[in-house]
């Protein structure tokens, strides 16, 4: 009888303590879309890739193979990679100069006006990062650009595009 009472008490205690409600913990964490960052860019663009990608980023249209060949020859003939890129970029951005490539082809750089940029700096910077770097800006980058553009009212969209196109990150894919 003692054993039966003891076993009954033991089973009862185990039954009571083992049947606990399982709690589901939920935390207020927002979903976040993961995107590539610049740390994964490790391959240097060839001169032809740089020119072709720059052309598409500025005009939203691909470059003809003849123009690609000619500009590739110009790029190679200059010798200094950075000087060559700055010269080609200046020529592309100078769409109102009659001697420029853009003017001769009838191309216009697709960019917002200064007023449009100033009216929504955050969207402008996000769009520019997506356009040139194929990624979203970090919060620190976004804040830096916001403060910089608010403090320097003489900076235009052309200047921002120029700085993105000659940056080290833009050299890689």
Task: Outline where the language-model segments fall.
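N-terminal hydrophobic targeting signals that begin at the initiator methionine
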Residues: 1-2, 20
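Sec-dependent signal peptide recognition
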Residues: 2-9
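Short N-terminal leader segment in a subset of presequences, especially plant chloroplast
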Residues: 9-12, 71
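C-terminal motif of bacterial Sec signal peptides marking the signal peptidase cleavage site
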Residues: 14-18
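Composition-driven recognition of low-complexity segments enriched
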Residues: 19-173
């Amino acid at each position: 009888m003692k054993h039966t009472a003891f076993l009954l008490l033991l089973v009862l205690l185990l039954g009571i303590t083992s049947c606990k409600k399982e709690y589901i913990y939920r935390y207020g964490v927002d979903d976040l879309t993961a995107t590539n960052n610049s740390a994964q860019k490790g391959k240097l663009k060839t001169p032809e890739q740089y020119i072709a990608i720059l052309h598409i980023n500025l005009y939203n249209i691909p470059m003809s193979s003849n123009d690609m060949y000619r500009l590739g020859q110009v790029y190679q003939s200059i010798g200094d990679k950075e000087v060559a890129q700055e010269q080609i970029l200046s020529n592309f951005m100078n769409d109102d100069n009659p001697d420029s490539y853009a003017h001769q082809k009838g191309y216009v750089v697709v960019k917002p006006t200064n007023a449009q940029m100033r009216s929504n700096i955050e969207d402008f910077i996000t769009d520019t990062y997506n356009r040139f770097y194929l990624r979203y800006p970090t919060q620190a980058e976004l804040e830096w650009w916001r403060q910089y553009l608010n403090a320097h009212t003489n900076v235009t969209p052309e200047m921002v595009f120029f700085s993105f196109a000659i940056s080290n990150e833009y050299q890689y894919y």
